[in-house]
């Protein structure tokens, strides 16, 4: 049940009645009529812009429309008050039974409360992490992994059919560097002294890979030229790194549906097929690009190249797809990969990249637009940097990794649940400070604790109720007299619960899972406020001695809070706490 959708339906019904009676002309478009929370809660529970958006096409003053509409809405039992404000905004205050009904709906639906069919089963591909298979995941990958995973869960909750995908960058030069680095560790495992020069990976995580290679092939590659061992070690090392990365993701609770190899695009005709598709649309040509201002990109050459006419699909400049020597640019396999996604029948694509890929957005959107004839939208979400702090100082790098803080460093310090929640306490395109000390504090300033504490408090109420012999079964709580919940602090919690279905749809429509974390913090705040009021006002306590009926109504409210928190945390990939330790 989306109460805002229900009340919008009431507004539209009243507008149609006004049309039937001649108070409004026929043929008006109601598509932009909205019912939303007011900017100022003091103005009521909901507000509608109906009069403002209909005034011009109706040829009437907005305030006149609003006053007629207000009179009609006030006649409905669900509306306690309808007031016209300013030039024609209409504020609605709903009757208490409307809010009380929300509690019953939450208890009846369980964690399915707020689920939406907005997606209508459309197929969405969410690609995230996609780190080079050259080492363990670092903290930047961690943010992208959490964001992408939570977004995929959110879209699933909103009715989409979601595929979670990891693109393995195993076709580029960095994999050759990995192979050479592993070869050095292989020689080291044979007792040779080695030196890591610039352009190799010195991380200790490759020691085990070098030893494993020795165990597999013995001394077969010792003293051999690179052409003998490069390809074999490249495959061996990539497999080892992907096993490491899969283990990192598992530690964070991230499971992919598809691991797609870049290497599979080469020698299979897939790149050629994608480029041929663009060529058939007149979007491939031979030409020379003007040198861009500032630092020259690696794919620019002062000679004729094969170019993609990406400017016809919103890009700033056309992009090289083949170098003058006939080799593909790095953009060509990316085009082919997204052509494959489009060919798999996805209705929408989402790519989650690091902030350093900002210059990549327009060209990739242009490619997908061209490949799909504008049918398949691509949304690219960029995750900004994470700064780590401990004891008031920047957190030092992992010796094992060589030069960066790993995902495991973070999860080992605070656990997967805390890591995931904190990574979603800022919008993805805003920098995030991750303070190892603060995220473990038991205070309101720590949103992880604050939300989990609300859920744990509900669990404690249920345990105390059981000890007092109060029936808190689903049947008993659903049958409770919710009309006993009339205090403003209780109604505030119910109003927040009513926002959940609408919030889910907004977050899914904008691809912004951080909205879920923000909402949970606000819901927890309203619940804690009610709890704290109970310390001073005995009738607000959840267990009323000697009054099972009132206790059951109040416990029903508490239980509904826990249900929604559980649903929200599930989207974020966080396990709700039954008690705080």
Swiss-Prot record:
- What is the reaction catalyzed? tRNA(Arg) + L-arginine + ATP = L-arginyl-tRNA(Arg) + AMP + diphosphate
Is Iron found in the keyword set?
no
The record's EC number reads 6.1.1.19
Q: Which PROSITE patterns match?
A: AA_TRNA_LIGASE_I
This entry's Gene Ontology molecular function terms read: arginine-tRNA ligase activity; ATP binding
GO CC: one term?
A: cytoplasm
What's a Pfam family in this record? Answer: Arg_tRNA_synt_N
The record's top EC class is ligase
Coarse class of the protein's main subcellular location: cytoplasm
Q: Where is this motif: 'HIGH' region?
A: 131-141
GO biological process: one example: arginyl-tRNA aminoacylation
- What's in the keyword line of the UniProt record? Aminoacyl-tRNA synthetase, ATP-binding, Cytoplasm, Ligase, Nucleotide-binding, Protein biosynthesis
The entry assigns this protein to a family as follows: Belongs to the class-I aminoacyl-tRNA synthetase family.
Question: Which protein, by its recorded name, is this?
Answer: Arginine--tRNA ligase
Q: Which organism is it from?
A: Ruegeria pomeroyi (strain ATCC 700808 / DSM 15171 / DSS-3) (Silicibacter pomeroyi)
- The coding gene here is argS
